[in-house]
Regions:
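Gly/Ser/Thr/Pro-rich low-complexity, intrinsically disordered segments
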Residues: 1-197
């Protein structure tokens, strides 16, 4: 059993038959797909289209953060035991002397709450970072993006720290490219100590 996103991207839709063709290769056969979550459709008027409304994790890499909601989650833990429960997510960046910063959003920024000024983007976000597509008041707001790469020997995992190397830093309105092996932290509002790691 594996998790997958349409076109391996938060924004996007894909027929299950096409996904099975794409995910089948020598030694690995994808033969069916189950809609494991609700997702954004045109009638919801929530964006990006195709984005799961709950959480999604693949091989220790968060595609969409689990959010406290009225529905529970189905998952398989590291010991291959099924878990059905409500789950929440909170990430932490420990920047040493520059401080510790918490974030709750992965790949889909939100601007409608006090804790929404920090978003983590990875390869599942699509080709570029983005602004909150559901809160037009945030369009055009300057932001700071800091690009991170896993340190040598590290791999993504949940419920455990990972060490990253800080790369470039950009200050603009977002929409910057995301490379497959690079992640971006985006901070809206005034740049704080996190942005000068």
């Amino acid at each position: 059993i594996e998790t997958f996103l349409a076109n391996d991207s938060i924004p996007g839709t894909e027929l299950v038959t096409r996904a099975c063709e794409r995910l089948t290769y020598e030694g690995h056969k994808a033969y069916c797909g189950i809609n494991g979550d609700f997702f954004n459709v045109t009638d919801h008027k929530e964006f990006p289209l195709g984005a799961p409304r709950g959480g999604s994790i693949r091989d220790g890499e968060i595609q969409r953060e689990p959010r406290d909601a009225w529905w529970g989650f189905a998952t398989i833990d590291a010991d291959n035991i099924p878990v059905f429960d409500h789950m929440e997510f909170e990430g932490t960046v420990n920047a040493g002397d520059a401080g510790v910063y918490k974030f709750q959003h992965v790949n889909i920024p939100r601007a409608d709450c006090d804790a929404c000024d920090l978003t983590f983007f990875n390869r599942y976000a699509g080709e570029r970072t983005r602004q909150d597509e559901n809160f037009s008041e945030m369009y055009g707001v300057e932001r700071t993006e800091v690009y991170l790469k896993l340190a040598a020997g590290e791999k993504w995992k949940v419920n455990s720290p990972v060490q990253c190397i800080v790369g470039r830093r950009l200050e603009n309105k977002g929409g910057n490219p995301i490379a497959a092996d690079v992640c971006s932290r985006e901070q809206v509002k005034s740049p704080g100590p996190f942005c000068v790691i």
